[in-house]
């Protein structure tokens, strides 16, 4: 998110209402203050799909209420700081409302907002009052008569964007000023009764399968009381009243004709269907399916079923290449691209290839020096809000994700998933036949094999040095550019690799997550634990090819081999003539064996 500007009167912090960053006041904001305009890409409604994040979009409407275009702030490059204002969980918690002026969207403070308060968007109270008036106009008295004392339907009420009736009901002709009011409308009017319950008219006793049908029936009684709808349909005990003879004729032709095709009409919205099966399928859209976990609503059982997977820990779909698991089948398809050799998007700076253009664009940001997002706790800078969010976890001492197989705990769920796959499920099934080392994916194995063959096809654009893998080349290039993108949050030290930063941070936190099961000794790195375990097993896998001596550590073998180099100057004990590769080893030997301290 390059060039993201946040005014001094506001600050970015972790949101209290949803994951990610939220916008907080740095000073008091008075009621009536206006901010904006909201920035985003202009899109047409038909260009949107269900996978997009609609929380970062606003409709811009014309003078007649028609949608001109959508302002989409999903792409950080085309948005501004208002994208960090989240929707209020309830109408009571809102402190901002969106209004439209011309073709611009502004955020209006609807209350005085104190310092260090998160800004939360809602809709104007006048919209709620208009909706309540509309509901009251349809209320029946206990005697079964229409109550005219509660007012008529609200006319000309404006939505939260300052335009009339922004949110249209997909099941009837009603429109509403906000999504929340529309949701209440769907629940109250289009929700089917549970069990044997039916919706009954208090005036005439007629029963209806859905509340909206009853509501339409109420309207007939109301119009009759006003002298409207003088033409009554008497077919099949229908009783529907219409305003004109032509309307009555059309109604009878569409609903009560003997033609089977004429009977394929939805009783809720009067939509015509071509077959019984299509009519049955259409009627499902008038059912509201509630998620009991998060209270989201869906218009089909299949949509609800797909949504429920997000609340489950089950990941039934596996990649057959690397065995990584996913909650949805479409996620597997998107993931498989990383295993493909076809990577048309190649970075000119580091040579790394990408299968997806958006991933390539995000990667190019890593070569930029701009870091507009700052951590309030340690002042560390980051290129993207996601990087900042991930960094904030190191300031949180809680390790909420616990492994069910062992006692290991983690701050991030993705780290836990990797731990389970590698340590407990042994997903490193791709094994090198030359050294027997195993890897999680075939692509990593292919890169590893180049270390055996000597193949080096990645060339440094600065010095011409060749490397076996793009990752090694990227790290090398940083030696030319001086780039150290991984900054320690506790000190000023920077690192060219993320692994180096992780190990360094443990020198500050004293964290030692790798514990020996034999003696409970703990280590900050897994390599340290592996080396320590050999003191219990007696294993010495590193053998000298000159004298057959074996060592538990590779560095000890390297030092030993120096003793076989005739050209290397050696430090020799003048008592026993034993040779040492380093003077400090000789000093220890003289002190321990011959009792001669260094003078």
Swiss-Prot record:
InterPro entries: PRDM5_PR-SET (IPR044415), SET_dom (IPR001214), SET_dom_sf (IPR046341), Zinc_finger (IPR050331), Znf_C2H2_sf (IPR036236), Znf_C2H2_type (IPR013087), Znf_PRDM5-like (IPR017125). Keywords: Activator, Chromatin regulator, DNA-binding, Metal-binding, Methyltransferase, Nucleus, Repeat, Repressor, S-adenosyl-L-methionine, Transcription, Transcription regulation, Transferase, Zinc, Zinc-finger. One of its GO terms (biological process) is positive regulation of transcription by RNA polymerase II. A zinc finger (C2H2-type) spans 167-190, 199-221, 231-256, 264-286, 289-311, 317-339, 345-367, 373-395, 401-424, 430-452, 458-480, 486-508, 514-536, 542-564, 571-594. Its EC number is 2.1.1.-. It is found in: Nucleus. GO terms for cellular component: nuclear body; nucleolus; nucleus. The keyword Transmembrane does not apply. GO terms for molecular function: DNA-binding transcription factor binding; DNA-binding transcription repressor activity, RNA polymerase II-specific; methyltransferase activity; RNA polymerase II cis-regulatory region sequence-specific DNA binding; sequence-specific DNA binding; transcription cis-regulatory region binding; zinc ion binding. It is an enzyme of class 2 (transferase). Residues 8-124 form the SET domain. Its main location: nucleus. Belongs to the class V-like SAM-binding methyltransferase superfamily. Interacts with EHMT2/G9A, GFI1 and HDAC1. Sequence-specific DNA-binding transcription factor. Represses transcription at least in part by recruitment of the histone methyltransferase EHMT2/G9A and histone deacetylases such as HDAC1. Regulates hematopoiesis-associated protein-coding and microRNA (miRNA) genes. May regulate the expression of proteins involved in extracellular matrix development and maintenance, connective tissue components and molecules regulating cell migration and adhesion. May cause G2/M arrest and apoptosis in cancer cells. This is PR domain zinc finger protein 5. It comes from Mus musculus.
């Amino acid at each position: 998110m390059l060039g993201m500007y946040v005014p001094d009167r506001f600050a970015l912090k972790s949101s209290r209402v949803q994951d990610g960053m939220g916008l907080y006041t740095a000073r008091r904001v008075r009621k009536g203050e206006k901010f904006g305009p909201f920035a985003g890409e202009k899109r047409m409604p038909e260009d949107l799909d269900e996978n997009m994040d609609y929380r970062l979009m606003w409709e811009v409407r014309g003078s007649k209420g028609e949608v001109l275009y959508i302002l989409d702030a999903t792409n950080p490059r085309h948005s501004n700081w208002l994208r960090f204002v989240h929707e209020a969980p309830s109408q009571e918690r809102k402190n901002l409302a969106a209004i439209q002026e011309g073709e611009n969207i502004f955020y209006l403070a609807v209350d005085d907002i104190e310092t260090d308060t998160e800004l939360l968007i809602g809709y104007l109270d006048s919209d709620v009052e208009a909706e309540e008036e509309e509901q009251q106009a349809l209320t029946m008295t206990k005697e079964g008569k229409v109550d005219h004392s509660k007012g008529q339907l609200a006319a000309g009420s404006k939505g939260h964007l300052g335009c009339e009736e922004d949110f249209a009901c997909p099941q009837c002709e009603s429109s509403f000023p906000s999504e929340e009011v529309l949701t209440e409308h769907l629940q109250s009017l289009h929700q089917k009764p549970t069990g044997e319950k039916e919706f009954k008219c208090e005036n005439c006793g007629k029963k209806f399968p859905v509340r909206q049908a009853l509501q339409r029936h109420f309207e007939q009684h109301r119009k009759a009381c006003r002298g409207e709808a003088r033409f009554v349909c008497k077919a099949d005990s229908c009783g529907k009243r219409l305003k004109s003879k032509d309307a009555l004729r059309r109604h009878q032709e569409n609903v009560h004709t003997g033609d089977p095709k004429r009977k394929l009409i939805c009783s809720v919205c009067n939509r015509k269907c071509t077959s019984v099966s299509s009519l049955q399928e259409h009627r499902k859209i008038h059912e509201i399916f509630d998620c009991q976990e998060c209270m989201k609503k869906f218009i089909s059982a299949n949509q609800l079923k797909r949504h429920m997977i997000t609340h489950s820990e089950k990941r039934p779909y596996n990649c057959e290449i690397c065995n990584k698991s996913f909650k949805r089948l479409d996620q597997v398809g998107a993931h498989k691209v990383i295993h493909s050799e076809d990577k048309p998007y190649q970075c000119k700076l580091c040579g790394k290839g990408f299968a997806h253009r958006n991933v390539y664009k995000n990667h190019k940001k890593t070569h930029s020096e701009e870091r507009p997002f700052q951590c309030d706790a340690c002042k560390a800078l980051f290129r993207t809000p996601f990087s900042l969010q991930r960094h904030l976890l190191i300031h949180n001492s809680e390790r909420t994700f616990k492994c069910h197989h062992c006692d290991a705990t983690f701050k991030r769920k993705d780290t836990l998933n990797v731990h389970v796959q590698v340590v407990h499920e042994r997903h490193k099934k791709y094994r090198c036949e030359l050294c027997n080392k195993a890897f999680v994916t075939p692509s990593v194995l292919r890169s590893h094999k180049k270390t055996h063959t000597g193949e080096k096809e990645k060339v440094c654009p600065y010095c011409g040095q060749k490397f076996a893998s793009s990752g090694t080349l990227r790290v090398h290039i940083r030696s030319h550019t001086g780039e150290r993108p991984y900054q320690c949050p506790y000190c000023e030290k920077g690192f060219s690799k993320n692994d180096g930063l992780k190990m360094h941070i443990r020198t500050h936190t004293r964290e030692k997550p790798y514990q020996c099961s034999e003696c409970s000794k703990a280590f900050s790195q897994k390599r340290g634990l592996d080396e320590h375990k050999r003191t219990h097993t007696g294993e010495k896998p590193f053998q000298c090819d000159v004298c057959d001596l074996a060592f538990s550590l590779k560095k000890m073998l390297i030092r030993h081999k120096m003793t076989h180099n005739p050209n290397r100057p050696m430090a020799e004990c003048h008592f026993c003539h034993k040779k040492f590769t380093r003077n400090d080893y000789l000093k220890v030997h003289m002190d321990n064996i011959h009792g001669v301290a260094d003078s």
